């Protein structure tokens, strides 16, 4: 007998954890640390993009069934990357290659997690 590991509650937990990490980094960690080292600024800025992508993928996919999750996650990642590229033209921010990299890494890790979550396991 094969049992799928997929659960809406699991996807919700991962998504809400991603949102909590975004708020934690933005409103708690950044203000407490007054270090303006370039590496620190890059890591903190890109980590928000990373966790926001993870949150978007898992919260949106928690409302779908198991089929097509990888394709849906791929479209979400491409949408996040497209948004990063058009931000300067919309007047909403600046283009940052490190954010694109963080989004790509988050998408890869999320799709790997999704593929493991919906795979069948022998009991």
State where each predicted segment sits.
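Bulky hydrophobic segments
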Residues: 1-123
């Amino acid at each position: 007998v094969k049992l799928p590991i997929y659960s809406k509650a699991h996807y919700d937990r991962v998504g809400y954890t991603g949102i909590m990490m975004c708020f934690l980094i933005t409103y708690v960690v950044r203000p407490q640390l007054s270090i303006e080292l370039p590496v620190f600024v890059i890591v903190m800025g890109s980590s928000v993009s990373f966790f926001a992508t993870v949150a978007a993928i898992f919260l949106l996919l928690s409302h779908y069934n198991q089929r097509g999750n990888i394709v849906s996650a791929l479209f979400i990642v491409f949408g996040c990357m497209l948004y990063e590229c058009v931000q300067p033209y919309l007047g909403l921010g600046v283009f940052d290659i490190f954010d694109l990299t963080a989004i790509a890494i988050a998408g890869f890790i999320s799709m790997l997690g999704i593929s493991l979550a919906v795979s069948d396991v022998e009991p």
